[in-house]
Curated annotation (Swiss-Prot):
Keywords: ATP synthesis, Cell membrane, CF(0), Hydrogen ion transport, Ion transport, Membrane, Transmembrane, Transmembrane helix, Transport. F(1)F(0) ATP synthase produces ATP from ADP in the presence of a proton or sodium gradient. F-type ATPases consist of two structural domains, F(1) containing the extramembraneous catalytic core and F(0) containing the membrane proton channel, linked together by a central stalk and a peripheral stalk. During catalysis, ATP synthesis in the catalytic domain of F(1) is coupled via a rotary mechanism of the central stalk subunits to proton translocation. Component of the F(0) channel, it forms part of the peripheral stalk, linking F(1) to F(0). This is ATP synthase subunit b. F-type ATPases have 2 components, F(1) - the catalytic core - and F(0) - the membrane proton channel. F(1) has five subunits: alpha(3), beta(3), gamma(1), delta(1), epsilon(1). F(0) has three main subunits: a(1), b(2) and c(10-14). The alpha and beta chains form an alternating ring which encloses part of the gamma chain. F(1) is attached to F(0) by a central stalk formed by the gamma and epsilon chains, while a peripheral stalk is formed by the delta and b chains. The chain crosses the membrane at residues 23-43. It comes from the Bacteria. GO terms for cellular component: plasma membrane; proton-transporting ATP synthase complex. It comes from Nocardioides sp. (strain ATCC BAA-499 / JS614). InterPro entries: ATP_synth_B-like_membr_sf (IPR028987), ATP_synth_b/b'su_bac/chlpt (IPR002146), ATP_synth_F0_bsu_bac (IPR005864), ATP_synthase_B_chain (IPR050059). Pfam families: ATP-synt_B. The lineage of its organism: Bacteria, Bacillati, Actinomycetota, Actinomycetes, Propionibacteriales.
Amino acid sequence: MQALLAAPLAKAEELNPLLPHAIEIVLSLVVFGLLLFAVWKFVTPRFEQIYTERTQAIEGGLAAAETKQAEADAKLADLEQQLSEARHEAARIREEAREQGAQIIAEMREQAQADAARIVEHGKTQIEAERQQAVTSLRAEVGTLATSLAGRIVGESLEDDDRSARVVERFLADLETIEASQAAGGGES
């Protein structure tokens, strides 16, 4: 009976659908090897080439970006330096303009003071000249009037010019002395 039972069991083992046949295993291994060889020989190098190209492109892009960034930083620093220099130049120009303005104002003030002093001096000179002219004119007129009045009062003719000139000069000198003493006395009180 064992033989009877062993025969169906051996046949059942042979027909087990879960276990593949040996030929299928061998054929699958050959196809897998061919497929592995094709992938290793053709696909992998292409993947490596594409990977290398992309890596180089990315690294080149990064290098270019770093170069551009360095150029941009250099340009920015240059522009900031130029801006700083322009600000310093503008401040220097403003300071020079302020100094020149102050100098011009001082020169104009000095010139105005000199002009005012010159005008005052000219006015004083002109007034002094007019005063001298008036004094001279008054002396001549006062002398003539005083001589004729004195002649009428005294009843004598004072026609002698030398004598009348001396009398007039003495009279005017006395007047000036009186005037000077009054001015000195009036200034003290």
